[in-house]
Amino acid sequence: MFWLRFQVRGLENVPMSGGGLVLINHQSFLDPPLVALALQRPVSYLARDSLFRVPVIGWILRSTCVMAINRDAASTASIRMALQRMNDGFLVGLFPEGTRSNDGNVGEFKPGFISLIRRSNVPVYPVGIAGTHDAMPRGGVRFWPQKVRVVYGKQLCPDEVSRLSVKGNEDKLIAFVRSAVEACKDEAQAWRDGT
């Protein structure tokens, strides 16, 4: 991806081994490979099942450890597979917005990631990405040369994640995680803008 001026910060926040859940803002189809590329370790993503039926995209997804999930009814099989991957020492990447941003800003988080947090005992890492929306916006079929910045945040406080994972605290957990991802995205955007 030589046409992107791609830089990262915070790689030291994500260990080179051990399972974990990586929660990322979603701007473009470029996000999954770029986030994983810098980590230099496999990241298994969850993607909506309908993408697997798109000829070229489906082949790529099946070839790269992507797990299909039905967004209308998160299947227990997909959740079990993601939990198994994390328990086996892999990172599982998820875009809690559930779709790409229309304008590059962080959108509303869907609650689907909560079951993974509740049922796993792995670190949770927020990641923010800026610039991929301009490089390949939603609905775009062309790449545009852009500066892209990715910020890997520190592991979310396990005690706070555990406290907020209790039934009835879903809105607080979503707000806590969204705030951490948005802080990483804002840092990436400021770095990209040179401010």
Residue ranges and their predicted role:
Residues M1-R9, T132-A135:
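Short gly/ser/thr-rich secondary-structure transition/capping motifs
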Residues F2, V14-A73, M81:
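Catalytic core of membrane glycerolipid acyltransferases/transacylases, capturing the structured
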Residues R5, G19, K147-R149:
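A residue-level signal for beta-strand positions that form part of recognition/binding surfaces
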Residues R5-F6, P42, M67, G89, ...:
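Secondary-structure boundary/capping positions in well-ordered alpha/beta enzyme cores
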Residues L11, Q27, G98-T99:
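A short, glycine- and basic residue-enriched loop/turn
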Residues E12-P15, R142-F143:
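A short beta-turn/loop motif at secondary-structure boundaries
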Residues A77-T195:
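Non-catalytic C-terminal accessory region of glycerolipid acyltransferases
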